[in-house]
Each structure stands twice: as structure tokens, then as C-alpha cells.
């Protein structure tokens, strides 16, 4: 495989990181470095009927599969293209009804196995890195992660054994471990979850907490654009995680999911950490121990809320958010990332409950510190401006709505590219109000 298989880029051995991607020519902010079609992808069950199962296009009037009546498509072409993969699920969904419930990871892995059988040769998604070359980090998995893989394998056999030939057990363990480390979540313009996918060439990029590129999606196509000036010889870095949090939290997440500690500029200098864990300016400032205790409380409540989402009512969830903010505000400023995390969750609950004023109130508090804590071209900041803009428009404040939507567009033109359908849709929203 030629190093220049992707124009102006090459695969190389990155010191201390293993494989990586390097620029051979300059790329300016907003430039598209490359795009990569999904090797395999799966639409999340909750988006069925809103997005095409094959190309993920969002549109009205999708046609449903005549057999299962659960998969929806743009047209006959999309349905035909998806059939070799949809047939793995179609009749099972009919037979099992409510009892058909494989996880998204299991569904994606089933599609990867089917794709490998249908298309054993290298695909256009693998110009620089093949799926079989993915890291699995098997030797680093703890018992909990190993048990999860075993239950995924059991589900794969339960739901797909009629329609798929499986490799041996140890190969399946490796494949699930590879998917866990190299899978991508496809999100829409408001960062809502649309599905999961494998993009081999995108997975070649290493991580940095000050990335020089950003990955966005156009349907099932991943696009990689520069968010900093990139010079010939520079390594191309993306971010694997949410960059809102302080260094210790980011590295905990990286170690848990990807088995490494980041040593980028942001992690070695910890320049942003003080502002991220901003403490209230009181006449008698909180002691170091009180701050440490509150950070510990914040991390615990974040985890508690994550679990509570699965079984508590919206009003109970909102109460957790409000009580935790009240407790943290005795030590933390509103701009503290742990406060922001709970405000963001509260905003999400308000949106779910259609409490537009409540959601707007939280969004207004969040946006300024978000703009400070995140990189300049951040999808988190763009999606927050977008939510605010749409809330203002819905509440008949056109001037504020237009201003917020234009701020979202300014970021998205760099991150998504000026011709992205999302941008046309937002411009249409502004004009139609």
C-alpha cells in the first residue's frame, strides 16, 4: 500500500504511539484532509423512521421494509444496498418481536462479520489501515471488560447464528475488543447519537487533547478537517474524548477506554485545569481538602446520574441535577466544569420534558464557559449555540435566535465544511422565521 494512498498524507511510526498519520503538505484551517466511507455501520434503534437505515439521510417520507416494517429507506436503491446486511436482522425482528434486543456493539460486529464474508478484499475505507490490523489491547482488559465481551459473544450467537457463520471463539474475542477500541459514534449537529460505525483510516489517527483535526459525518461518510494550521511533517491528531474536563479526568477516561496516558501540551502544562475547576472567591477561600472532597463528590454524582438515566423519571433526574449544583456551588463557581456537566444534563432533561424556558436558562449559563474551556472549533460549542438558537426561535426571540445560529454556523463551516447539508438546513431555519 503506497504511503500517499490518501493525498498529502502518509502512515508512519509515531514515537511512543505506534502507528500514526502524518501530513506531507500544508493544510489550512477548514481544509478537508480526507474522507472515509464507513466499513460497517448501524443506525441506532431510536432513530428508525427518522433516518435511512442505509445512508443515514434524515428526511420525511422514508419507505419501510415490507417484511419487518422496522427499517426505513430513502428509496429502492438504499434498500437494495442494505439488504445483504439488513437480512441478518429482518426475520429475527419479526419472529422475536420485543425480545429482539442485541446491543448496538453486537449489531455492528455482526455487520462487520458479514462484510468480511461478502467483501474479503481491502475496501476503500482501508487505504491506510485494514480492519484486521486494528489494536485490540486484549492483554490489558480487566475481568469486567472480558465478561462484557463474553456476554456480547453470547448475544451474537443468540440473535445471528441462523444467518452468519462465526469464526472461532478466540477470534470473536479479538474482534469485539477491536470494535470497542476502534468504533465510532455517529452524531448529528446537536450531538445526538445516530449510530455506530467502523472507519478504519480514521482510526489510524492518534489522540491529542489539543487536536489539529476534527471528525464530522455526512451520512455514513466520515470527514476529517483541519482546525489548526498543519505543516508538512506534522502528525495529524484527533481527540478521542470530550475535552471539557481537567487533565486527571481526561487521562482516567483515556486509560479506561484506550489504555494510554496522554502527554500532549495540554496534559503536560495543565494550563486550563485551574479555570476548569474554578473555585468560588469567598472571604475565606475553601481549603485544599474541601476542594478535593467536592471534586470527589462531583465525579461520583456524574457517575450516579449516568446510571440513574436508565431507570429514574425526568423529574427525579432534574432533582439530582439541582441538588448536586446546589451542593457544589458552596465551593465551585458556575464556570467550573463539574457544575457545567450537571447544568448540561439538566438542560437535556428540560428539553426532553419540553420545558423550553428551563432549557434556555441552563443553556445561557453554559455557553460562555464552554467557549472558554473548549478549543476554538468545537462541536460541543457549535451544538450548544445551535440548541440556544433553536430555543430562542421557538420562543419567538428571532434576533437572539439568529445571532446564536450564526455563531453555530461559523464553527460548523470549519468543522463540517461550507457545503454540509446541516449548514443549509440551519440557514433555511433563519430565513423561514
Curated annotation (Swiss-Prot):
An example Gene Ontology CC term for this record: cytoplasm
Q: Name where it mostly resides.
A: cytoplasm
Catalytic activities: L-lysyl(4)-[histone H3] + 3 S-adenosyl-L-methionine = N(6),N(6),N(6)-trimethyl-L-lysyl(4)-[histone H3] + 3 S-adenosyl-L-homocysteine + 3 H(+); L-lysyl-[protein] + S-adenosyl-L-methionine = N(6)-methyl-L-lysyl-[protein] + S-adenosyl-L-homocysteine + H(+)
List the expressing tissues. Answer: Highly expressed in heart, skeletal muscle and brain tissue. During cardiac development, it is differentially expressed with highest expression in the neonatal heart while very low expression is detected at 12.5 dpc and adult. Specifically expressed in cardiomyocytes (at protein level).
**Family annotation (InterPro entries):** H3K4_H4K5_MeTrfase (IPR050869), SET_dom (IPR001214), SET_dom_sf (IPR046341), SMYD2_SET (IPR044419), TPR-like_helical_dom_sf (IPR011990), Znf_MYND (IPR002893)
Q: How does it assemble?
A: Interacts (via MYND-type zinc finger) with EPB41L3. Interacts (via SET domain) with p53/TP53. Interacts with RB1 and HSP90AA1. Interacts with RNA polymerase II and HELZ. Interacts with SIN3A and HDAC1.
Q: Other comments?
A: Although specifically expressed in cardiomyocytes, a conditional deletion in heart does not lead to any visible phenotype.
Query: Under which name does UniProt file this protein?
Result: N-lysine methyltransferase SMYD2
Encoded by which gene? Smyd2
Amino acid at each position: 500500500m503506497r504511503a500517499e494512498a490518501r493525498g498529502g498524507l502518509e502512515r508512519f511510526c509515531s514515537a511512543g504511539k505506534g502507528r500514526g498519520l502524518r501530513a506531507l503538505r500544508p493544510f489550512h484551517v477548514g481544509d478537508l484532509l480526507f474522507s472515509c466511507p464507513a466499513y460497517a455501520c448501524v443506525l441506532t434503534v431510536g432513530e428508525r423512521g427518522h433516518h435511512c437505515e442505509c445512508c443515514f439521510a434524515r428526511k420525511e417520507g422514508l419507505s419501510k421494509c415490507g417484511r419487518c416494517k422496522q427499517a426505513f429507506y430513502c428509496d429502492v436503491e438504499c434498500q437494495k444496498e442494505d439488504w445483504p446486511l439488513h437480512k441478518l436482522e429482518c426475520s429475527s425482528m419479526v419472529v422475536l418481536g420485543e425480545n429482539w434486543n442485541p446491543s448496538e456493539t453486537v449489531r455492528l460486529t455482526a455487520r462487520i462479520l458479514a462484510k468480511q464474508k461478502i467483501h474479503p478484499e481491502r475496501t476503500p475505507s482501508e487505504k491506510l489501515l485494514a480492519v484486521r490490523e486494528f489494536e485490540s489491547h486484549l492483554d490489558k482488559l480487566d475481568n469486567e471488560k472480558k465478561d462484557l465481551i463474553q456476554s456480547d459473544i453470547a448475544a451474537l450467537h443468540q440473535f445471528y447464528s441462523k444467518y452468519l457463520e462465526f469464526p472461532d471463539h478466540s477470534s470473536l474475542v479479538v474482534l469485539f475488543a477491536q470494535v470497542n477500541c476502534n468504533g465510532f459514534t455517529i452524531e448529528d449537529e446537536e450531538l445526538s447519537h445516530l449510530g455506530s460505525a467502523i472507519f478504519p483510516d480514521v482510526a489510524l489517527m492518534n489522540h491529542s487533547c489539543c487536536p489539529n483535526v476534527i471528525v464530522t459525518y455526512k451520512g455514513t461518510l466520515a470527514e476529517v478537517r483541519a482546525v489548526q494550521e498543519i505543516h508538512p511533517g506534522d502528525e495529524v491528531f484527533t481527540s478521542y474524548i470530550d475535552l471539557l474536563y481537567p487533565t486527571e479526568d481526561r487521562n482516567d477516561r483515556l486509560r479506561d477506554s484506550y489504555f494510554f496516558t496522554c502527554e500532549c501540551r495540554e496534559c503536560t502544562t495543565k494550563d486550563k485545569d485551574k479555570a476548569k475547576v474554578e473555585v468560588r472567591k469567598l472571604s475565606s477561600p475553601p481549603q485544599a481538602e474541601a476542594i478535593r472532597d467536592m471534586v470527589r463528590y462531583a465525579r461520583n454524582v456524574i457517575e450516579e446520574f449516568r446510571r440513574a438515566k436508565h431507570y429514574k423519571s425526568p423529574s427525579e433526574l432534574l432533582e439530582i441535577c439541582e441538588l448536586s449544583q446546589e451542593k457544589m456551588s458552596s465551593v465551585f463557581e458556575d464556570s467550573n466544569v463539574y457544575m457545567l456537566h450537571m447544568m448540561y444534563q439538566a438542560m437535556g432533561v428540560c428539553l426532553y420534558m419540553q420545558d423550553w424556558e428551563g432549557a434556555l436558562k441552563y443553556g445561557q449559563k453554559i455557553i460562555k464557559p464552554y467557549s472558554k474551556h473548549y478549543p476554538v472549533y468545537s462541536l460541543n460549542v457549535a451544538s450548544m449555540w445551535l440548541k440556544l438558537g433553536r430555543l430562542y426561535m421557538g420562543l419567538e426571540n428571532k434576533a437572539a435566535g439568529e445571532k446564536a445560529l450564526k455563531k453555530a454556523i461559523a464553527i460548523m463551516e470549519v468543522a463540517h465544511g461550507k457545503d454540509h447539508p446541516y449548514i443549509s438546513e440551519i440557514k433555511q431555519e433563519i430565513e423561514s422565521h
